[in-house]
From Swiss-Prot:
Activated by phosphorylation. InterPro entries: A-D-PHexomutase_a/b/a-I, A-D-PHexomutase_a/b/a-I/II/III, A-D-PHexomutase_a/b/a-II, A-D-PHexomutase_a/b/a-III, A-D-PHexomutase_C, A-D-PHexomutase_C_sf, A-D-PHexomutase_CS, Alpha-D-phosphohexomutase_SF. The active site is at S91. This is Probable phosphoglucosamine mutase. GO terms for molecular function: magnesium ion binding; phosphoglucosamine mutase activity. It catalyses: alpha-D-glucosamine 1-phosphate = D-glucosamine 6-phosphate. It comes from the Archaea. Keywords: Isomerase, Magnesium, Metal-binding, Phosphoprotein. Belongs to the phosphohexose mutase family. It comes from Methanosarcina barkeri (strain Fusaro / DSM 804).
C-alpha cells in the first residue's frame, strides 16, 4: 500500500484522503508514539481529517496536543517537545486537496523507512486499542505561534522596511504579519485572512499567481513583496520594482548570506540553475532528488549549512530541517535592509534556460530512461538520482520523468547556445520514444 509521496500523504478530500484513512494513520501512529502535537492549515476539510487523526492516536494511548490553525513550520518547530508532529495540509495545492505530513522532533519529515513502516502497519492493521483508562490525554495549546516567533526574533535583526505581504489566505496570516511588525517593519497585508477556499489566488506562490502583489509593491512604494503558499512552508519574493524573484535567484541570495565568510555545503535539487553554484564560489554544491524532503535529508547527511529548492522551500538547519517560510521572510527583510533586492539580483550571473516536455506513458518511462541514459552518458558528467542530468563544459541538460503526469520533461541551461543543448537532448528523447 503506497500512501506517501514526496510531500507526505496528499490527495482530494473525501476521495483519496478520507476520515477513515486519517483514522488508520492515527491508530498506527498512536501505537508507536507516546506523545504527538497536531495542527492544520485553513483548508475546509482540515478539521475533519485532524479530528480523525486525534481519535486514532488517543485511542491507541498517545497523548495529543492540538495547536490549532498554524503554519507548517510552526508545527514542525513545536514538534521538538514531542515524539512526533502531525500537520494536516496540502501546502500549495488547490483547495479541494488535503494531506497529512508527519514530522520528527528535529523538524525532519518522516523518511522513507518511517513512511514504509506506517504504510505496512495500516495494511496489516498492526495496532491495538487501549483500555478506557489508558486512552491518550488530549489538550489544546495556544502558545505555539508565539514560541515560533520568539525563536526567530532571537536570530534576525530589526528593520524599518516597508513590506507588502501576500499570505494567499493561508496559514501564514497567523504569524508572518505580526512577526514582521514586531521586527519594526511597516507591513501592508494582502489576503491575510485565512480562508480554505483560497478565493484570492492559487496557493502556489509563483510568478503567474502573484500579479496583485507585484502591482501592490509598486503602488505602495514598498521595499519588497513577500508571498506564502497555503501552509507557509514556502516563501517567494518580489523586488521593489515589482519584478518576481525566481527560485534560483532566491537560492543564491540566501546562500550568499548563509555562506558569507565561510566555506560550507549547500544542498539543492537536480533541476537547480548553475547560477547557484557559480554564485557560491568555494562552497560545495550537493544535488538531490527534487522535493524538499530529499533536500532536507541531504542537508542532514552532509552537514550542510543551508539548502532549498527553487519552488520556494528554504531550509536553515540551525533552526530546523523543515522548510521555514516564516524565518525566510524575516531573514530576507534583514538582507534587503543592507541592499535593494533588485541590486542583489543584478549581481547574480544569468544563463539561458529552455524547458520542454514530451508525452510518455507511465509504464514506458523506465525503458525510456535507460535508452536516454545510454545516449547521454558519453556527453559529460552524469547524475542519475532523479532522471538523467548531464553536465557539460557549456551547461547541463536534465531529462526527467514527471511524477504526476504521463510526460517526460527536458530542461537545459547554457552559458551560450542553449538551443543547441536542448535540441540535442530532445532529439535523443524522441528517438528513445520510438
Amino acid at each position: 500500500m503506497k500512501l506517501f509521496g514526496s510531500s507526505g500523504i496528499r490527495g482530494i478530500a473525501n476521495k483519496e484522503i478520507t476520515p477513515e484513512l486519517a483514522l488508520n494513520v492515527g491508530l498506527v501512529l498512536g501505537s508507536r508514539k507516546k506523545t504527538a502535537v497536531i495542527g492544520r492549515d485553513p483548508r475546509v476539510s482540515a478539521p475533519m481529517i485532524e479530528h480523525a487523526l486525534i481519535a486514532g492516536m488517543t485511542a491507541t494511548g498517545c497523548a495529543v496536543t492540538e495547536i490549532g490553525l498554524v503554519s507548517t513550520p510552526t508545527l514542525a518547530y513545536a514538534a521538538r517537545e514531542y515524539e512526533c508532529g502531525v500537520m494536516v495540509t496540502a501546502s500549495h495545492n488547490p483547495s479541494e486537496y488535503v494531506g497529512i505530513k508527519l514530522w520528527n522532533p528535529d523538524g525532519m519529515a518522516f523518511d522513507s523507512a518511517q513512511q514504509e513502516e506506517i504504510e505496512k502497519a495500516i495494511e496489516d492493521a498492526d495496532f491495538s486499542l487501549v483500555p478506557w483508562n489508558l486512552i491518550g490525554k488530549f489538550e489544546e495549546d495556544g502558545n505555539a505561534i508565539r514560541a515560533h516567533m520568539n525563536m526567530i526574533k532571537k536570530l534576525v535583526g530589526s528593520s524599518s522596511l516597508k513590506v507588502v505581504l501576500d499570505c494567499g489566505c493561508g496559514a501564514g496570516g497567523t504569524i508572518t504579519p505580526y512577526l514582521l511588525q514586531e521586527l519594526g517593519c511597516e507591513v501592508i497585508t494582502l489576503n491575510a485572512q485565512p480562508d480554505g477556499h483560497f478565493p484570492a489566488r492559487n496557493p502556489e506562490p509563483n510568478d503567474e499567481n502573484l500579479t496583485m502583489l507585484k502591482k501592490a509593491v509598486v503602488d505602495f512604494g514598498a521595499d519588497l513583496g513577500i508571498a506564502h503558499d497555503g501552509d507557509a512552508d514556502r516563501m517567494m519574493a518580489v523586488d521593489e520594482k515589482g519584478n518576481f524573484v525566481s527560485g534560483d535567484e532566491m537560492l543564491a541570495i540566501f546562500g550568499l548570506y548563509e555562506c558569507s565568510g565561510k566555506k560550507g555545503t549547500v544542498v539543492v535539487p537536480v533541476d537547480t540553475s548553475m547560477m547557484v553554484g557559480d554564485s557560491l564560489q568555494g562552497s560545495e554544491i550537493v544535488r538531490t532528488r527534487v522535493g524538499d524532503v530529499y533536500v532536507a535529508e541531504g542537508i542532514k547527511q552532509s552537514g550542510a549549512i543551508y539548502g532549498g529548492e527553487p519552488s520556494g522551500s528554504w531550509i536553515f538547519p540551525k533552526i530546523s530541517y523543515c522548510p521555514d517560510g516564516i524565518y525566510a521572510a524575516a531573514k530576507l527583510v534583514e538582507i534587503v535592509k543592507e541592499k535593494k533586492l533588485s541590486e542583489l539580483r543584478e549581481e547574480l550571473p544569468r544563463y539561458a534556460t529552455k524547458r520542454g516536455a514530451l508525452p510518455c506513458a507511465n509504464d514506458k518511462k523506465a525503458e525510456f530512461m535507460e535508452k536516454v541514459k545510454a545516449k547521454l552518458e558519453p556527453l559529460g558528467k552524469v547524475l542519475d538520482i532523479d532522471g538523467i542530468r548531464v553536465e557539460m563544459d557549456n551547461g547541463w541538460v536534465l531529462v526527467r520523468p514527471s511524477g504526476t503526469e504521463a510526460k517526460v520533461r527536458i530542461t537545459a541551461e547554457a552559458r551560450e547556445n542553449v538551443d543547441e543543448i536542448f535540441d540535442m537532448a530532445e532529439k535523443i528523447a524522441k528517438e528513445a520514444l520510438k
